[in-house]
């Protein structure tokens, strides 16, 4: 598990390290939001890394924007740990 505190740090990690198997990201982050970070990450990785959004933002515009980015999953906070586990299992069982 690699923890990045903001979108810029996550992109820096992707530029200089082996790609992770999964990115779990909030939409509302400092410096660069999760949507912008995902767009840039997809350019860096060719969209090869599934992104699971875990966020308190549940308005229709945000959800649809994440879907257009081909988000692998979307969990609204607050959540139970079993939701994360279930989504990660689902993603890894069917991701490309």
Question: Residues of each region from the PLM?
Answer:
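Active-site beta3 strand of CheY-like receiver
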Residues: 18-24
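Receiver (REC) domain active-site loop signature in two-component systems and cognate sites
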Residues: 29
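C-terminal output helix
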Residues: 61, 79-89
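Active-site T/S-Asp motif of two-component receiver
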Residues: 24-26, 37
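Helix N-cap/capping motif at the beta->alpha junctions
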Residues: 3-12, 34-36
